[in-house]
A protein has these predicted regions:
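ATP-binding N-lobe of GHMP and related small-molecule kinases
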Residues: 1-99, 117-126, 163, 172-175
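Short beta-strand scaffold segments in enzyme catalytic cores
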Residues: 14, 38-42, 138-142, 148-149, ...
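A generic local secondary-structure boundary/capping motif
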Residues: 29-31, 129, 139, 155-161
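Short, basic/glycine-rich phosphate-binding loops at helix/coil junctions
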Residues: 47-60, 111, 133, 202-211, ...
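Glycine/serine-rich anion-binding loops at beta->alpha junctions
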Residues: 90-119, 137, 238-253
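Contiguous, small/hydrophobic- and glycine-enriched helical/loop subdomains that border
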Residues: 108, 112-149
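Conserved, helical-rich catalytic subdomain that frames metal- and/or nucleotide-binding sites
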Residues: 142-239, 254-294
């Protein structure tokens, strides 16, 4: 059996550059690991492959489930035939879904790391990355975490030096936002010329120079998202934004105490709020390290 943490992420800015011929969008974003995480348990056993979560029960074994896709793609990559079997995956969910925090992608990457260790520890890193890319745009980032710039449809990841740690108030509304819907709204409302072609100078010292192109179109349909971003700024956040395609928003603070004070100020009905912090590459590796139990 293997236990592994699956940390969430936030997007520090997200620029949509254009819509590609394959239907995906060309993007550029800074992805940052945070301490909030799910816990994934992988057990080798006889019988069919199962994927379940105590909070939702059995999960679908199809392309709507990134964890199942990881199991299936890795199974094929190591030369096995037929339907995957002999493994049970249990996911203890803490990361809100449809929130732009990358929970499903991080779970998939955690299962991939665990299964490589259990099934094929000598598998080449390039093949592991190929499996990650084939499953989802964000999955490659979660193989290593930390701070990185992601381009292409999000799968081209280049590691960056870790940012100075900051604390976050993450606010999650009672509704989720579909990634497909968010990009469809952008297609109808925006022009690629409106997006930045390069990261703004000095962004590491001034995160408020970064923008999320999707925030504005999503807030058109859900005004409360923009209102919560404003509340976080008023509460003292040095930078506040929606993450990914939403629906979660966050504010950055220099200390845990400041984040806790802000959390009390921005609480309101219909929103879940929590305090967490960013993770350096080393902290991500320590948190996401496999615990193997025979």
């Amino acid at each position: 059996m293997a236990h592994v943490a699956a940390p969430a992420k936030i997007n520090l800015g997200l620029n949509v550059l254009n819509r590609r011929k394959d239907g995906f969008h060309e993007v550029r974003t800074i992805m940052q690991s945070i301490e909030l995480h799910d816990v994934v348990s992988v057990t080798l056993r006889r019988g069919p492959c199962t994927v379940r979560s105590p909070s939702v029960g059995d999960m679908p074994q199809d392309r709507g489930n990134l964890v199942w896709m990881v199991v299936e793609h890795l199974w094929r990559s190591i030369g096995r035939s037929g339907v995957p079997h002999g493994v049970a995956v249990t996911i203890t969910k803490r990361i809100p879904t449809e929130a732009g925090l990358g929970g499903a992608s991080s779970d998939a990457a955690a299962v991939l790391r665990a299964l490589v260790r259990l099934w094929c520890p000598s598998l080449q890193r390039g093949l592991v990355r190929d499996v990650a890319e084939s499953v989802g745009s964000d999955v490659p980032f979660f193989l290593n975490g930390g701070t990185a710039v992601a381009t292409g449809r999000g799968e081209c990841v280049r590691r960056l030096p870790s940012l100075h740690r900051f604390w976050l108030v993450v606010a999650v509304p009672s509704f989720g936002v579909s990634t497909k819907a968010a990009y469809d709204w952008w297609d109808r409302a925006c022009s690629p010329e409106l997006s930045r072609c390069e990261l703004p100078a000095g962004w590491r010292r001034r995160l408020d120079r970064l923008t999320n192109d999707l925030e504005y179109v999503v807030a058109e349909h859900y005004p409360e998202i923009g209102e919560m971003v404003s509340r976080l700024r008023i509460a003292g956040a040095s930078f506040a934004s929606m993450t990914g395609s939403g629906s979660a928003v966050y504010g950055a603070f220099q200390s845990h105490a400041a984040a806790m004070r802000a959390r009390r100020r921005v609480r309101q009905n219909g929103w879940r709020t929590l305090v967490t912090k960013t993770l350096s590459l080393t902290e991500f590796r320590n948190l996401a390290r496999l615990a193997l139990i025979e």
